[in-house]
Structures are given as structure tokens and as C-alpha cells.
Amino acid sequence: MLQKREKVLLLRTFQGRTLRIVREHYLRPSVPCNSPLCPQPAACRNDGKLLAAEVTHYVIPDWKVVQDYLEVLEFPELKGVIFMQTACQAVQHQRGRRQYNKLRNLLKDARHDCVLFANEFQQHCYLPREKGEAMEKWQTRSIYNSAVWYYHHCEDRMPIVMVTEDEEAIQKYGSETEGVFVISFKNYLDNFWPDLKAAHDLCDSILQSRRERETESQETHGKEYPEHLPLEVLEAGIKSGRYIQGILNVNKHRAQIEAFVRLHGASSKDSGLVSDILIHGSKARNRSIHGDVVVVEMLPKSEWKGRTAALGENDSDDKASGESPSEPMPTGRVVGILQKNWRDYVVTFPSKEEVQSQGKNAQKILVTPWDYRIPKIRISTQQAEALQDFRVVVRIDSWEATSVYPNGHFVRVLGRIGDLEGEIATILVENSISVVPFSEAQMCEMPVNTPENPWKVSPKEEQERKDLRTTHLVFSIDPKGCEDVDDTLSVRTLNNGNLELGVHIADVTHFVAPNSYIDVEARTRATTYYLADRRYDMLPSILSADLCSLLGGVDRYAVSVMWELDKTSYEIKKVWYGRTIIRSAYKLFYEAAQELLDGNFSIVDDIPELKALDKQSQQAKLEELVWAIGKLTDIARHIRAKRDRCGALELEGVEVRVQLDDKKNIRDLIPKQPLEVHETVAECMILANHWVAKKIWESFPHQALLRQHPPPHQEFFSELRECAKAKGFFIDTRSNKTLADSLDSANDPKDPLVNKLLRSMATQAMSNALYFSTGSCAEEEFHHYGLALDKYTHFTSPIRRYSDIVVHRLLMAAISKDKKMEIKENLFSNKNLEELCRHINNRNRAAQRSQKQSTELFQCMYFKDRDAETEERCIADGVIYSIRTNGVLVFIPRFGIKGAAYLKNKDSLVISCGPEGSSEWKPGSLQRSQNKIISTTAGGQSVTFHLFDHVTVRISVQASRCHSDTIRLEIVSNKPYMIPNTELCHQSSLLKSELVKEVTRSVEEAQLAQEVKGKVIQEEHQEYCQTKGRSLYTLLEEIRDLALLDVSDSCAM
């Protein structure tokens, strides 16, 4: 029977008054104890994760230990850990949401032997707070009382160790109850885990850092920064419009002096500002760190400053500032921090000389973070000399107003500086990517497929699914080496003469049950992480590379979308969704499919499924396959043409494939070449994603997971418009349709790279595409700007995207709505779905960053061991795509590299080019305008560099001990190194824009002809089916890396 208590809460209002709130608090005779020793498991309802049976004791940390030593408690070696509800709530209220979510994720993680015990809802454990009792004392008393009850509940069969930092509690409770021991956390590690050195080192580091904070708080220092305003003042200021809330973004090229606040939440609508707010200098930043949610006070207009237009020390991309410092922009200062974005940071210790120069107390060391945007961190350690050559992980503990730098503590060693595995580990830590192996509990949920016990289609599934194994020619088209084949395609002619197009996606949800251990793990990872030389899977390989991978010649479960199309206009007549059984006939690579599409049948020997056949059978199968690929391509052209009429964008990204040998040595860097078959596959995937989005929204209008791409801010197009103007083109950015048409017409027949770079600039101006719950925003906000679709989602890659798993469950619930009510019960509510979307969006950004950073790592490794002065491959043709006050930004097509090239060096010498084009450094000056920069020597010689000029550059590597190595570009001649862009010039006799216009006209004519029952123009149809030219289609997979046209449904390895 429930017992009712009254719980009194004292809350402070914005006006500073104390508000007394009384809430009902119900106590239960039993709550889940999650112990295998429970004498009444049915009464306790122990349905979730249980503690391990083989432990020698249970450990219960008090609230203070959970707050200060949570990262030690995360060690998987520490087993039998029971987190009391009282301790968890203390973390939530005193350490904020970030630390609390970290604790929640630890409790969910099947790899960690820890559970939550809701002691404040258990009638024998709950203790009311006594009058005048300090909160900290009540929390410790409550946790101890719960520990005693838990010991007796397990029938005194398992000793309990309560760890606390409260010396008074140790003295009071230490020997009060037999079987319940109360000791300090340090004492616990010394006695129970003496050989767990990493835990001891981390504990010592945290303890030392805490003691120093306490000592410093007692000392009087001058204030380095102003104090942050109280929370109630900040919230009232935001509400009144005096202050503005936003996310701090530090400019990595000028991390010491330049940061921007991107408006967040209501501030973005109420402030009236159309640009970011400049935060100039570290004082104005006021101890906020990149990614923090901050509150800003605007400065008077007379104090506004402008961005710097000069190249910084590590400029390497398009994100460098482009505005002149003479153009002031809204400027402010940080007055408070609403949410800290502190995380693990990879740092490097200073050299011996630097340590000596830091002062007499050598135990306090300033370490330099790998990320330029993070300030130096002061830590205390005696290992500085031993760790000078290593990358290590630290965490920030505090940043007081009296300290120039934040204080932190040492966590662990990653690896040696420059070592490949150490640098990869750095990228993973910097992006908060965990790559630990799947746990035993998770693997126990997996199906078995071994030679002794092969997996088979079950009779039940054969009855419930549509069987396509003998009726449909199903095949996949993927990159070479792809193992996780998410999608397959089919096309066939129906008895009524119409066509049937099918997209068949791996049925991952059949094997991954909602809220199972593997489902929780996949949700946490959210995506498969693809690096330049490896990948980290979201799902175990038994699923990702075997039973869910739609490999050739084996039976697989799929979720299919199949459309009936008009045989001439390809108009969709009807659509079917459902679960199927397929057997893929071919596992084609993109290159082989393109060769077949182009009529090169000699590629047959590279297709294993055809190679083993006799000539007659081979010819028949080949004709069937070629027809299917050709028909799919023709359908895809018409689908794309229809989207183009609505304003779909074809943008440009840079993707480089790292070619490795068997020993993982880098053989070459190869920019990915677009093929028309890429577009064919992508268009089919876009079609499936669009139709599934419509279906799940119709069925669940308030809790469907869709993907939106908001229109970009017009001011972000300024550089694109100016650059196009330099070549005589006008870019109309009023809508996606006008932008697409303008980019299609901005072609320089002498240099195709001009259009490529303009599209790349358009990509940089775009906002990010994001997942969202349909119950969280208005329908007019669902639109996908880049794809020109009113509703869009991700359905086609459930092996490597958790969003697709959610969408599959929604689709199954939609088509089974009246049949299986239990399916609906496993769907997320709007609130929970929106929280999940934020998590997935965050993990997607991490995946994109890590992929980009790993590619840059391998680019540097490729050039690092080469002599830039003599090696031919270190000299390349480059195109200037942006002008700065002291140099230019250059794109190198051969290697897909973008970077800065200085025209003025550190000695203030400027570049001078002779009649042959060769360069040298001389005294002089630079004069910059919008579209060109002139270098004039003291002797009067001048050289002009224009936008889109081709120059010869030397590629070398700028080594860095504390940060990642970077590519260094040096202009060695103002002449092209070779015929500009030879490799790309002759790719196609038809530009993509021309092809789409022709196909659009074909569709319109076919529709008109059908209306008047006229004759279809067969000549044009034949032209499109038989074209051998490669389109200039830019891979949608590339755009995924830029979080825009993210329809990539192929793997990167």
C-alpha cells in the first residue's frame, strides 16, 4: 500500500523572493533493487539490468563522491556499484544537466555493472529532513540508511561498502552496522583495487585539483575577470531584452581575440539582429569556452569592432572571416554562462624549457589543448617530464574570476605525438566518440550464423512477408569494399505495361528490439563513424556485415517501398510499403555499374555473379541487368528533373579518398570522381525517404522523425555573389529555385572549376540539415531547402544511422496501425523524440568532423615524408577562390585540398614574380580589393592575383607539437602548373544543367503528348537512355559530410 508524504521545496523567483511549494510524495513498500540476491524479485519488479552475481561486495558512493569522482566510477573494473536516487538528484541540482546525463548514460550502459536504487520512494529507506538539518548531512544520512536497508534486504549475504568524503560520517557510521562499511573513496581504492593504477592516478589527480581549488579560494587575488551575474538576473535580462542568449563559437584562426555568439532560442527572434555577435578579446569572453551557452550584453555602437580579414596562422578553409575590419558589426561581452560545454580535452605538455619558464612551482603546469579554440589549462601533476612526448586527456574542474586560465586535472594517456593510433585516438576524444567493444550482454542478444548453425528464414516470416526472391531482379550498387549494404533496387515491367520501381532496405528492426541492450547502445552511438582508414560500427558485425547486409545470393529480410509508375511519363500511380524477403542477384560496384550503363560490357569479367556462367546464360543475364540499370537511370533523371523544377540544388563538396596499401601506408590521395550512377542510386533513395516521410507524418503527425533543411541567411551569400560578379555572373539567392538556376548558368567554358568553386561557396553558405520531431514545429518548417521537398526523412540506412531505425519503427507502426497496438507503445513521445533528435544531430556533427579531421591527418602524412623542394607530387595547380588582406585561399583539384597561401611572410616581405612566373620574397606592400590583390615591391615591380586565377603551388606540411599538423601552401609561380583542370574538363560532353534541362523538357513533352493522346518523341527518349557522357553530378554523399544534401546511402569503406 502506498504511503503519502508531503515534500516541501523552497524555490527562488526572478525577483529574489523565496517560494514555498508543497508536493505529494508517495512511498512504496518495494522498488526495483536490481540485485540477483533479491529474495522477492517479483515484488521488487527487477525487470531491468541486474548487478553481477560474482562480485565480492556492493559499493554505494555518497552524493559527494558521485559528484567529484564519477569519472573514476566509470571504470568498467569497478563492479557492483549502486547509485542512490539521493546522490543522483544531488548531481542533477548541483552539477547541472551535462553531468547528470553522463550519470544516466552510465546507468544505461550494459558494459558497466551499476544500477540505480530509488531509495527516496522506498518506505523503509526514505528519511524526512529534520528541522535545521543541512542538506549535505541529510543526503549522507539518507544514503547510509538506504545502504543498511539494502544489506538486510539481500539477507545479509553481500557486504556493503559506502564510500564518502565526509570524515564525520566515517567516524559516526564506520562500525555502526555489521556488514556495512563506511570508508573514504581513496581508502576504498587502496584496499579493494590496489592494482588499478589508472584509477589511482585519476583519483589522485582529482583530489589534488580539488585541494588546490580550496586553497586558492581562501587566498585573496586580484580579479582577472568580472564575476558572472546571478542566474535570476540573467533570465530576467533575457526576458526583458537587455541581454541576449547564444552559443559561443571561437574562431580557431584567431582563438585568442575573436569569438562569435550565434543567437539561440528566443533571442534569435526577439533581438532583431541578423548577424552573429562579435566577442573581441579574452576579457570580453569572460571565462566562457567554445560551445558554452552564454548570455551577452551588447556594447554601444561606438565600441563595435569588425572581423579581421587577414589570414591567420592556421587558416585552411572557407570559414575564415571575409569582412573588412573597417565594417563594424554587433559587438558584446559575456556577462554569464547558462550551460557549460566542458568535455574531455586532448592536450600536450610543454617542453622542458617551457616548464622551467612557467615558474618555481613545477607541479602546476599549463598544458596546451589540441583544439586551438580551447584556452590553456592549468593542471597539477608530477609526470610532466615523463609525458612530454604524449597526447593526454584532461578535464576542466573550474575557472575562477581570479585565474587567467581554467583549472583541470589529468585523466589518461592517449599515445605518442605523431603516432597514427595516438592521433586517431585524439580525433575520437575531441569529438566525444566512444569506440569500446560491444558488451557480452549486447552480443547475447544477437542471432547466430555459423557454418555449424547457419541462419535461415523462419517459416513464420515467410508467411507474413511478401516474397520477392523469385519474382524480382534485386541488386545493389555500392562503393568497392563495402560490407554494410543497406539498400538494394529493383525495376520490372508489370502485366499492364507499367513499371514497378522498388527500393529494398535492410530490416534492422527485426533483429534490434526496442529498448534492448543493443538498441540502447545503437541509440547512444547514433551513427557509424567513418574515418579515412577505418570505421566504427553502430551495430555489431553479425548484423552490419552479415545478417542485415543485403549481400548477393543470400536470403535477407527487408523493408520495401515499391511504386507503380506510368510506362512513359514515370508518374507514380500507387505505392506499397511492407516487409519482404529478398535475394540480391548482384553486388555491383559503382564503377562496374557505370561501365555497363556506358555500354562497356568487357567489365563482365569483374562481376562474379556473371563470370561463372556459360556464354548463353551470361548474355541473357547481362541483357536483363543492363536493361534494369538503364531503366533505373532514366527514371532517376526524370525524378531529378521534377525536383529541379521545384528548386533542388546541386552543390559542391570536396571528398578525398585515401588509397592505402596492405600495410596501411598511403599510396595516393584521390578526389572522388562523380558518376551518373551515383545520382541514379541517390535519386531512388531520396524518393523512398520522401514517400516514407509522408507516410509516417500522416499516421503520426505529432511524433514522426523528419529531417528539415532551413533556408540560409541571405547575408551568408555575400561572398558567393561577389565572387560570381568577378566573372560576370549574377547569382540570385532569393529562393532555392533562383539559386539553382543561377548556378547552372554560371559556367565558364574555359574553366569548369569556376562553377565547381561557386557551388562550393554556396554549400558553405547553407545552414545545417537537422532531425526533428513533427510535434515540435509548424508544418511550414518541415521543408528541405536543398532537396526542394516538403517532407523528408532518413529511411534508407538503418545499419549505420539510428534515425533510420526510429523511422522503420514508425513506418511499421503506420502500416500495422490497426493490427498490433504493442508496436505503437514502443514509439517515442514528441518530447522524448525531440531530445533524441538533438542527440543524433550532435553525433552526426561529430561524425562529420572526425571524418574531415582524419582525412586531413592522412593528407599531412602523405606529404610529410616528401621533400617539397624536389618531389614532383608536391607541386600542383591551384585556383584562387578567396582574397584576404595578406594572402589568398587556394583550392588544389588534384588532391582536393583547400588552404591558405601567404603573399606577405612573417618578415613583412611580399611575393614577387618574374617574367617566367617564378616567385621570390622582396620588401614591398600589398593592396587588396574585392576581387584581386596586388603585390608591389619597393623597386616598383607588381604582380596581381585575381579570383579564379590558376597558380602553381608547393605543398608542404607545417608540423605542430601541440596541435594537428597542417598543409602549408606556397605560391611558386603565378602561372598554371598544367592545363587547368585537365582531368575534369573532358568528363562530359553534356553539363549536368544541360542534361537536366533536356530531361525536364522531355517530361513536359511526354505529359503533353499523353494528354492529347499523341505520340511520344522516341528520339529524345533514346538520346537520354543511350548517353555515354558522365554527368557533373556531385555526390550527395559529399554533401552529407557538409550536413546538407545528406542522402548518402553508400558506405565510405
Curated annotation (Swiss-Prot):
It is found in: Cytoplasm. One of its GO terms (biological process) is RNA processing. Belongs to the RNR ribonuclease family. The lineage of its organism: Eukaryota, Metazoa, Chordata, Craniata, Vertebrata. It comes from Mus musculus (Mouse). Residues 365-431 form the CSD2 domain. GO terms for cellular component: centrosome; ciliary basal body; cytoplasmic exosome (RNase complex); cytosol; plasma membrane. Its EC number is 3.1.13.1. Residues 465-816 form the RNB domain. InterPro entries: Dis3_CSD2 (IPR041505), NA-bd_OB-fold (IPR012340), RNase_II/R (IPR001900), RNase_II/R_CS (IPR022966), RNR_Ribonuclease (IPR050180), Rrp44_CSD1 (IPR033771), RRP44_S1 (IPR033770). It is an enzyme of class 3 (hydrolase). The modification Phosphoserine is found at residue 989. Component of the RNA exosome complex. The catalytically inactive RNA exosome core (Exo-9) complex is believed to associate with catalytic subunits EXOSC10, and DIS3 or DIS3L in cytoplasmic- and nuclear-specific RNA exosome complex forms. One of its GO terms (molecular function) is exoribonuclease II activity. It catalyses: Exonucleolytic cleavage in the 3'- to 5'-direction to yield nucleoside 5'-phosphates. Keywords: Cytoplasm, Exonuclease, Exosome, Hydrolase, Magnesium, Nuclease, Phosphoprotein, RNA-binding. Pfam families: OB_Dis3 (PF17849), RNB (PF00773), Rrp44_CSD1 (PF17216), Rrp44_S1 (PF17215). This is DIS3-like exonuclease 1. Its cofactor is Mg(2+). Residues 236-310 form the CSD1 domain.
